[in-house]
Swiss-Prot record:
Subunit relationships: G proteins are composed of 3 units, alpha, beta and gamma.
Positions bearing Phosphohistidine: 266
Taxonomic source organism: Mus musculus (Mouse)
Gene field: Gnb4
Domain of life: Eukaryota
GO molecular function: GTPase activity; protein-containing complex binding
Protein's UniProt name: Guanine nucleotide-binding protein subunit beta-4
Gene3D superfamilies in alphabetical order: YVTN repeat-like/Quinoprotein amine dehydrogenase
InterPro entries the record matches: G-protein_beta_WD-40_rep (IPR020472), Gprotein_B (IPR001632), Guanine_nucleotide-bd_bsu (IPR016346), WD40/YVTN_repeat-like_dom_sf (IPR015943), WD40_repeat_CS (IPR019775), WD40_repeat_dom_sf (IPR036322), WD40_rpt (IPR001680)
Length: 340
């Protein structure tokens, strides 16, 4: 037996030992614990608004913290800020690169950010004295595409990239202050914890990781998916998170139990998941799929409670407002829909 084979076997044994140790701590399943709970019943949501204006596939959207404005990014090379109440466009920002994959709204509402195949995170100031929107900072440094970005505040932003790393940036200086390394595949998505002290990432190595923003260390790793993880989203409590993968499943992982609690899948669903988000209470998990639909799952019992159907192409992104009153879905059909 070659030395490499021996090392592979040792690694496999260690992996099994870790899994056994995790299982030993698992004294009950979520299905058992929630068996006495009522199911949420059928969830029926209607499209209340359709936001028309993009001329090509929409790749990303993010709600502002006022639960009214949202930003969307499209292959047409535009970043649009929408008023979801009136469907008016507040700003249409032409981008230097039309190959945009992510966008983010700052908590203050003063800035939006975007990035993609240009490997750069571009920050735009919405509140300039002149009234026009302009690039206030460009953050180059990643050696792969930018897959996701989220503001901590007006001065800091976290990015994930196809170069297998995530990074914390000081926007003022334009420098990476922390680099988060540990994934062995493209990092596709990140989600900030409610207390903004940690974040979780999902990657093409089929694993998700919990990172400490303060010291840059990976605190926990979670496996179980058998294909790329495209989306991650923290549970509102901050003690769990959901993932969506190309293996056609969503999974719920618990940080304190250090393991997977629940799998969300259906025999009829054989396509990948592009995006996931929880309702404000955490009882519902919404997931966008390649088959043009968005499924609504009972997050605690694991059953499918509804489907949001209406897009004519892949649902590429979705988000729930901070006040929990509406869901937005964005699609390759070039439209955004607001549901409740």
């Amino acid at each position: 037996m070659s030395e490499l084979e021996q090392l592979r076997q040792e690694a496999e044994q260690l992996r099994n030992q870790i899994q056994d140790a995790r299982k030993a701590c698992n004294d009950a399943t979520l299905v058992q614990i929630t068996s006495n709970m009522d199911s949420v019943g059928r969830i029926q949501m209607r499209t209340r608004r359709t936001l028309r204006g993009h001329l090509a596939k929409i790749y990303a959207m993010h709600w502002g913290y006022d639960s009214r404005l949202l930003v969307s990014a499209s292959q047409d090379g535009k970043l649009i800020i929408w008023d979801s109440y009136t469907t008016n466009k507040m700003h249409a920002i032409p981008l230097r690169s039309s190959w945009v994959m992510t966008c983010a709204y700052a908590p203050s509402g003063n800035y939006v950010a975007c990035g993609g195949l240009d490997n750069i995170c571009s920050i735009y100031n919405l509140k300039t004295r002149e009234g026009n929107v302009r690039v206030s900072r460009e953050l180059p440094g990643h050696t792969g595409y930018l897959s996701c970005c989220r503001f901590l505040d007006d001065g800091q932003i976290i990015t994930s990239s196809g170069d297998t790393t995530c990074a914390l940036w000081d926007i003022e200086t334009g420098q990476q202050t922390t680099t988060f390394t540990g994934h062995s595949g493209d990092v596709m998505s990140l989600s900030l914890s409610p207390d903004l002290k940690t974040f979780v990432s999902g990657a093409c190595d089929a694993s998700s990781k919990l990172w400490d923003i303060r010291d840059g260390m990976c605190r926990q790793s979670f496996t179980g998916h058998i294909s790329d993880i495209n989306a991650v989203s923290f549970f509102p409590s901050g003690y769990a998170f959901a993932t969506g993968s190309d293996d056609a499943t969503c999974r719920l992982f618990d940080l304190r139990a250090d393991q997977e609690l629940l799998l969300y899948s259906h025999d009829n669903i054989i396509c990948g998941i592009t995006s996931v988000a929880f309702s404000k209470s955490g009882r519902l998990l919404l997931a966008g799929y390649d088959d043009f639909n968005c499924s609504v799952w009972d997050a605690l019992k694991g059953g499918r409670s509804g489907v949001l159907a209406g897009h004519d192409n892949r649902v590429s992104c979705l988000g729930v407002t901070d006040d929990g009153m509406a869901v937005a879905t964005g699609s390759w059909d070039s439209f955004l829909r607001i549901w409740n």
